[in-house]
């Protein structure tokens, strides 16, 4: 089972395409949608929804996959549920870069402060990151340096921020899920 968490643009047609591509790894791909506008509510909703979905699966190694803001959540929700995560062009600092886009971006800072201290150290090797060299939204070199001590980092020379095509990375994602 793969949980797919969309980015800030929840209605992008690319989400369906990414889910379809992930079905080459596992036919059971589930969209876990969230509002993107209310971080504290989103966290509660995602925790409940993932726990509920896991009760209805016999997959011994479910995987979280998130793009952009979805990767922010995939890392945290995956950690709190003991799941591996794939973070694609993760938005690591929505409290800074979501100003003016959502109602309460400061809630992300509050969530970070209330999260398990040093959770990345406790989550080492439980996530893999895929970064676009040509990401038009974030400085992925800087973000990769924040995560490289904890997670493996892969680079893509073609895809933009929304990462329309996962095909080149599906074998690595599958190997990571099954390892």
UniProtKB/Swiss-Prot annotation:
Pfam families: UPF0227. InterPro entries: AB_hydrolase_fold, UPF0227, UPF0227/Esterase_YqiA. Belongs to the UPF0227 family. This is UPF0227 protein Shew185_2404. It comes from Shewanella baltica (strain OS185).
């Amino acid at each position: 089972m793969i949980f797919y968490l969309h980015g800030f643009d929840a209605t992008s047609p690319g989400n369906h395409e990414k889910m379809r591509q992930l079905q080459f790894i596992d036919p059971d791909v589930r969209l876990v949608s969230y509002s993107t506008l209310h971080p504290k509510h989103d966290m509660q909703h995602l925790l409940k929804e993932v726990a509920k979905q896991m009760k209805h699966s016999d997959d011994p190694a479910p995987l979280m996959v998130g793009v952009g803001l979805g990767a922010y959540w995939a890392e945290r929700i995956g950690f709190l549920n003991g799941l591996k995560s794939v973070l694609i062009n993760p938005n690591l600092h929505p409290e800074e870069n979501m100003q003016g886009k959502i109602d309460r971006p400061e809630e992300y800072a509050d969530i970070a402060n209330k999260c398990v201290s040093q959770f990345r150290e406790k989550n080492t090797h439980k996530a893999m990151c895929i970064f676009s060299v040509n990401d038009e939204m974030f400085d992925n070199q800087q973000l990769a340096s924040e995560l490289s001590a904890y997670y493996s980092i892969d680079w893509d020379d073609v895809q933009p921020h929304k990462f329309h095509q996962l095909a080149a990375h599906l074998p690595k994602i599958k190997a990571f899920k099954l390892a």
